[in-house]
Amino acid sequence: EISLGLVGSEMCIRDRIDMVTTPDGSLVAMVHCNNCTSDLNAWVNLFKEYQELLGIPVDMDEIYGKLYNHALTGNTDCGGLISYNYISGEPVTGLAEGRPLFVRSANDKFNLANFMRAHLHASVGVLKIGNDILFKEEKIKVDRITGHGGLFRTKGVGQRILAAAINSPISVMETAGEGGAWGIALLGSYLVNNDKQQN
């Protein structure tokens, strides 16, 4: 998901963009996607299972790192390969249920780099659609976007894929791999400590 603070902005209410507030009441537009890397993770787990069958020790960080970095060596058009990563429905694109699908023609460049690149691009596809609504239709301007979550654990890869998708620079903190749980912990700490300060 991508959340943008709307300081002094007015925005039309849209059913595809979640309007929420921060603990201090600031308005935030949130592009929330239900799928992101869920389908990609399923494929990575398939590679993990194959590696286990060969009797090779499995280190998930190494598997992700090698596959993600290898994706960057693929064709920029993913060799024609297309991934529809919908494990579940997606409100931003109006789909009630998901059915993941991988599509290629006989003439496409079907190799591991293009396969992984197609899945990485698919993982941010809904974020791109939602952000196009904010940036192009609503004319929202942003100062910075910070990426977080498992997609950003492999240095530079998720950052580069998302930056290309939404045509914006992406910053990533050292704790980026902690994802939503990190943010939830910070929010919980804020709520607890803020209550103590008010009492």
Regions found by a protein language model. Give the residues of each.
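Active-site core segments that coordinate phosphate-bearing ligands/cofactors
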Residues: 3, 9-146, 151-199
